[in-house]
UniProtKB/Swiss-Prot annotation:
Protein name per Swiss-Prot or TrEMBL: MST50-interacting protein 11
Classification via CDD domains: WD40
PANTHER family the record matches: RECEPTOR FOR ACTIVATED PROTEIN KINASE C RACK1 (PTHR19868)
SUPFAM superfamilies: WD40 repeat-like
Amino acid sequence: MAEQLILKGTLEGHNGWVTSLATSMENPNMLLSSSRDKTLIIWNLTRDETSYGYPKRSLKGHSHIVSDCVISSDGAYALSASWDKTLRLWELATGTTTRRFVGHTNDVLSVSFSADNRQIVSGSRDRSIKLWNTLGDCKYTITEKGHSEWVSCVRFSPNPQNPVIVSSGWDKLVKVWELSSCKLQTDHIGHTGYINTVTISPDGSLCASGGKDGTTMLWDLNESKHLYSLNANDEIHALVFSPNRYWLCAATASSIIIFDLEKKSKVDELKPEFAAVGKKSREPECISLAWSADGQTLFAGYTDNIIRAWGVMSRA
């Protein structure tokens, strides 16, 4: 049965671009977002006809753009990365910062939790990758064979059988690091422009990367090789695998593309109706993506400060 995505509603509350989105399996009615307005918002999702949800709590503390956010697997904590050079660990029930992570010497662009929530990895414009414990202690800084430009994205593999960290950089490289030794395992070479994002499939077997060259490259993390590429035809800002379908979603400068990885074809392309923009201004772009845990809703954060929720439906 062919499927498509339909716009279900919007979430409005940020006063800056929505830079990152995170969902929780433990709390399906919660969405977390980060923004250039220096805050994170915890949303309560109601999915009503009139309103898709409302801001339950605003997380304040960062003194600059918040670039990335993730939720712990138990749904109790969130991590945020900021251009103020720090990370913060938040208790979601109270909205308080429980730890600040200080050590990067430039904007922090990305943060990720390990599968057991005991380790944290961050990537920065200082070109380093740092490993932390949840107490805020930096346990290791990866610089040897590291990125020669900004580290744009870092992600832990969810697969305990192959414990690796994947990173991407403005040096056009995807790097795979062995978690046990923090040593470089593989350099994945192929992109012709800076890379904005990497994402790992739910089973940890696949990694996808994308950026300036408009190509999504898929890598086999178990075999350490390039599998194939999918053309998005425009700069890629964000990538996310579906939790329950063999799909990869790409947020590009012009639309959101849903790829079927089995057929290597487009399932759908999402472009909301934007209010008319002047000749000089650009249409809003999607720069962040997250699936609901059940894979039925795709959340998309835009440069018009709005989060849009798309629902998977069967094509009539």
